[in-house]
Amino acid sequence: MSASTPSPLRVAIIGAGQVADKVHASYYATRRDVQMVAVMDSHPEQARAFAERHGIPSAWQDAREMLEAVKPDVVSVCSPNRFHFGHVMAALEAGCHVMCEKPPAMTPQEADRMRMAARKAGKVLAYDFHHRFALDTQLLREAVI
């Protein structure tokens, strides 16, 4: 890339399930400013298949090993809910910005620790609440409130 064009964001995905496949990776594939560099899943065959399907150069079974070796700029945490805290904290400790699926954590205390870790690291920690602005959500909100 030229000096005037920034390098693409290097994104790693933790969790190779449906949300990672149909939402995160599908969206990243449409972006010229994003390069998917790694995927991790506790089931290695699922990680490999996901990587092949999306043209991702490496598949991993251990998040910390992946983060150390690949050094992504951003991590999408799409793992099962009970693993969000550990995966988010590992990504922040590795110096990555994080996009985490909902729910952010299993307890308010975990969510607060994640927020503080992001602040201390000077990294963005964002949560994916994309349905908040969907028409059906807005209509339901109006009916309830």
Language-model region placement:
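Residues that form or flank phosphate/diphosphate-binding pockets in enzymes
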Residues: K22-V23, G86, Q109, L135
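Beta-loop-alpha module in the N-terminal Rossmann-like domain of NAD(P)-dependent dehydrogenases
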Residues: H43, P57-A117
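Active-site phosphate/pyrophosphate- and oxyanion-stabilizing loops and adjacent acidic/basic residues
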Residues: A25-S26, R48, R64, Q138, ...
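Short, well-ordered coil/turn segments that N-cap beta-strands
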Residues: V34, D73, C96, K123-L125
